[in-house]
């Protein structure tokens, strides 16, 4: 095995040397975070192992457990409360199926700052008879009095993004969970824009479920995510599907050497009472797990609190200077998350050519744009964006 590229996480920011040279100014980690040099090398080591052509001490089964342990440490969860899923949205769908909402009925309360890819989930549930209440944001923020009014004893699930992909709004999950739990409702949080970027503690929040993909602030690739289910919630759920990872104590009556007493009993088994025992069925993309083995160590050793603190001066100057240009910020003023969103009429037509020329990459939509700051950005990046926006007609 090759030596994984080492980088001292305690070194001063920006951590540009941790990554490959970036083309221009990259302010788009909210879409896809760059993979670090060490993460790429970890993936390459896994590929070499898959060649089975050299001596190695690679153990992907051990690595799988180690990565679950690292993610558990990152969010203050127990490892048995976690499993792998295919994506954030896959995890959200599994929770809905495990609650058997369509079969049992119920009410879902959500808001319009939830991930737009989840709109159709609740739209389709509504078509099938589930009452769905969607709270509208006001100036990029959520009024919890509206959640207080909407959540009742009829409510089964509250579904939100703990940090909104639209504008970086961060929910007060503890407050929301207190409101929901008072009525017996459970809370799901899409946390793909939260974990790894801003401190997150599942125990402190009281959240029942989270799902988090790995290609944004966890600094790996697509095709994998983590699902968290609070251990005391499991008895309220039904397994949405079945597979070998859910099984323990499997005894077969099929193969040579097995005891075959009768034709009816082909196998015996017990089911694991854990998040994996409810939701895991398949082999995951191990190459992404290999990346995570490096990137999660980097995040843990660097410290999410330190990452959060580093970007605050950049966020402040960007908000102040860009708003001074007449572009209204859509992100709540007290936000500490890495995302800033600004309204901009005809942004696709007016802004895209300007930023392309300046070599600046961020997310541009019809009438707004969003930037995302990470550990490799610095104040010069912020100032170059501001200078470019001053040329906007």
Where are these regions (language model features)?
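Pyridoxal 5′-phosphate
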Residues: 1-393
């Amino acid at each position: 095995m090759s030596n994984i590229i080492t980088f001292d996480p305690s070194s001063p920011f920006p951590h540009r040397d941790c990554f490959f040279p970036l083309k221009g100014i990259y302010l788009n980690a909210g879409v896809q975070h760059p993979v670090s040099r060490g993460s790429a090398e970890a993936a390459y080591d896994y590929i070499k192992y898959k060649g089975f052509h050299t001596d190695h001490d690679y153990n992907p089964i051990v690595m799988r457990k180690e990565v679950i342990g690292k993610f558990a440490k990152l969010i203050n969860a127990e490892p048995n409360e976690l499993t792998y899923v295919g994506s954030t949205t896959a995890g959200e769908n599994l929770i809905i199926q495990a609650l058997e909402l369509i079969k049992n009925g119920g009410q879902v309360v959500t808001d319009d700052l939830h991930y737009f890819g989840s709109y159709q989930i609740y739209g389709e549930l509504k078509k099938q008879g589930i009452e769905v209440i969607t709270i509208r944001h006001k100036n990029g923020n959520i009024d919890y009095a509206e959640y207080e009014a909407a959540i009742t004893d009829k409510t089964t699930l509250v579904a939100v993004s703990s940090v909104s992909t639209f504008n970086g709004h961060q929910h007060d999950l503890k407050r929301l969970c207190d409101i929901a739990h008072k009525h017996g409702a459970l809370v799901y949080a899409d946390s793909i824009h939260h974990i790894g970027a801003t401190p997150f503690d599942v125990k402190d929040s009281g959240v029942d479920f989270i799902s988090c993909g790995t290609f944004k602030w966890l600094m790996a690739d697509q095709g994998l995510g983590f699902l968290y289910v609070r251990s005391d919630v499991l008895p309220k759920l039904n397994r949405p599907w079945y597979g070998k990872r859910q099984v323990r104590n499997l005894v077969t009556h099929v193969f040579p050497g097995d005891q075959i007493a009768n034709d009816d009993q082909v196998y015996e088994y017990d089911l694991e009472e854990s998040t994996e025992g409810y939701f895991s069925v398949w082999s995951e993309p191990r190459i992404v797990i290999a990346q995570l083995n490096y990137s999660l160590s980097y995040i843990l050793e660097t410290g999410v609190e330190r990452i959060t603190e580093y970007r605050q001066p950049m966020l402040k100057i960007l908000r102040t200077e860009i708003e001074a240009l007449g572009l209204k910020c859509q992100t709540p003023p007290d936000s500490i998350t890495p995302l800033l969103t600004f309204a901009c009429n005809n942004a696709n037509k007016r802004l895209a050519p300007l930023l392309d020329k300046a070599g600046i990459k961020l997310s541009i939509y019809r009438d707004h744009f969003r930037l995302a700051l990470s550990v490799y950005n610095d104040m010069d990046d912020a100032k170059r964006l501001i200078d470019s926006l001053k040329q906007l007609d």
